[in-house]
Amino acid sequence: MARTTPIERYRNFGIMAHIDAGKTTTSERILFYTGVSHKIGEVHDGAAVMDWMEQEQERGITITSAATTAFWSGMDKSMPQHRFNIIDTPGHVDFTIEVERSLRVLDGAVFVLCAVGGVQPQSETVWRQANKYSVPRMAFVNKMDRTGANFDKVVEQLKARLGAYAVPMQVPIGAEDGFEGVVDLLKMKAIHWDTASQGTTFEYRDIPADLVDVATEARSFMVEAAAEASEDLMDKYLNEGDLSEQEILSGLRERTLKVEIVPVFCGSAFKNKGVQAMLDGVVHLLPSPADRPPVQGIDEDEKEDTRAATDTAPFSALAFKIMTDPFVGSLTFFRVYSGTLNSGDQVYNPVKSKKERVGRILQMHSNNREEIKEVRAGDIAAAVGLKDVTTGDTLCAQDKIITLERMVFPEPVISMAVEPKTKSDQEKMGMALGRLAQEDPSFRVKTDEESGQTIISGMGELHLDIIVDRMRREFNVEANVGKPQVAYRETIRKSDVKSDYKHAKQSGGKGQYGHVVIELSPMTEEERKSENVKDDFLFINDITGGIIPKEFIPSVEKGLRETITSGPIAGFPVVGVKVKLVFGSYHDVDSSEMAFKLAASMAFKQGFAKASPVLLEPIMKVEIVSPEDYLGDVMGDVSRRRGVLQGQDDSPSGKIINAMIPLGEMFGYATSLRSMSQGRATFSMEFDHYEEAPANIADAVTKKG
């Protein structure tokens, strides 16, 4: 089957935003204008097409990135048809993993901002993630119809807070109740969308007299930004004082693709104004898969390799999301970087070293699906029937193996015990949690060896709430959950602490004998970055002259590594410790791997106790947006929670307070902040670092442990 849309006319982009910037409504309008959705789904009614998990519709926040394919021929239907693969991403900090996952497979992004709230704390987190993957992006200032909407202020914030070279492509006509449309700075015409047709038709008019000067100045800024793309354009601009529409677009496109500028559009998705022109911007300014550098990976011999975005290159794809679907079972969403794949083909997963057969291939439109026979470079689709694939795995041709860069997922910071309400649900709960962990690598499940309890860990309270909720809805497992527990860590402060332990049991017959002398020290920052460090622990063998035979050294390391998973203070993992094996002895007959493993373990426990052991607690970077009236209460509360204030910023909705607060003090914070501010303050938090817990906290944790 031949390719229906040339790859140059593909746009794989994500819609990213802070909560409440109107991202889901914007996505809905895109689906409506591209003809996929016949009725506009409003988030207010819990009917949005993109938010297709029940909890998302209830909570009105987007959790899962749903991938949708749509087509666009321009606002005035004059362009050749372009194929959009749109990925909707969540804006809540507990789900940054979802954002990271989608950014990895996108070519570009549309950043939706609220014209009233502007650049919110969370926008900065998402922006940083987009910088990490060098994703070209444009901005859409939404909610221009809301009281307090201010386009210029948001453009300034893009520059000041995000360091973006923001280039407005439009100027709004009016704001708040008086928002009527936009001035297109390329054509220097006013665009008015027809309300009766829900914005599907529009007309160009002359620019209102009071906006001519503003528009002329904004256009000069835009043309100048375009001219800086190349010497030729700059020469023409300096000589003639202007550039043609085509030259402006090609200059802006070139600079957007290099992530040098961020073109800015505006509108009100809710009022059906502006999204249409923004979609034209996606075509003109965001990259096709062919505009992005070839994807990088490593081949079978661990050498660097690349794949170009062509149908003739060997097949390579990245599985970026696993979902459990009530009708077809497990769905693997994947992005094809190169080559083609037909349903029924075999693919190779180099991460798991396994071959898999691709059963059916589905083209997803939110949660409706259409079966297709093949996918080609640039496509995003979902495969049915892949058994052993985890988020972040590569799928490739068996004869041309490549492993694409793995995604890095953060360690969970919060845990809670969970048990089924009825014994008969135990097995069902195990299966449900297994499925959910396969979908979401930032969610972990383990069994506590001592208590036999099932412990679930994740990125925040909301994250775990939603997991428990999904167990109930999707797997019919009712569960009781324990109180959230903090993921503490243990380490030492003293250097070069010697510990000598001899494990000797000789009671007739073959005995056991292992003797080790080790030195414990905290790792330096440089050492922690070294590639020999695994699980934040460094083992150095300093034995010479066969004092301990070579074959027993791995057992010593194994004994140490098994011990650090549960530290001596309160059973939390040990981090940042370097252990040097400096001396020991052995017995020709009685020494064994087991004896050395035990000796190493005991030497470590004794040495750790002498090396000024300390408990570390996770510190969260918290950003609170509060109206000024409640500032005193909010800041007093931050101090009571052992928070350290990092500074304040102004925000349209009051003040932004930045603070570092221990996670242990943040449980239930959402509820107490709501009552403190009568529901008007909001906050977001993400893990920042570990630091030593004060003695009273360490004592309380140790007693509990």
Swiss-Prot record:
GO biological process per UniProt: ribosome disassembly
Sequence ranges assigned to domain tr-type G in this UniProt record: 8-290
Keyword Nucleotide-binding: yes
Gene Ontology cellular-component terms listed: cytoplasm
Name the UniProt record assigns to this protein: Elongation factor G
Keyword Cell wall biogenesis/degradation assigned: no
Protein family per UniProt: Belongs to the TRAFAC class translation factor GTPase superfamily. Classic translation factor GTPase family. EF-G/EF-2 subfamily.
Organism listed in the record: Xanthomonas euvesicatoria pv. vesicatoria (strain 85-10) (Xanthomonas campestris pv. vesicatoria)
Sites where the protein binds GTP: 17-24, 88-92, 142-145
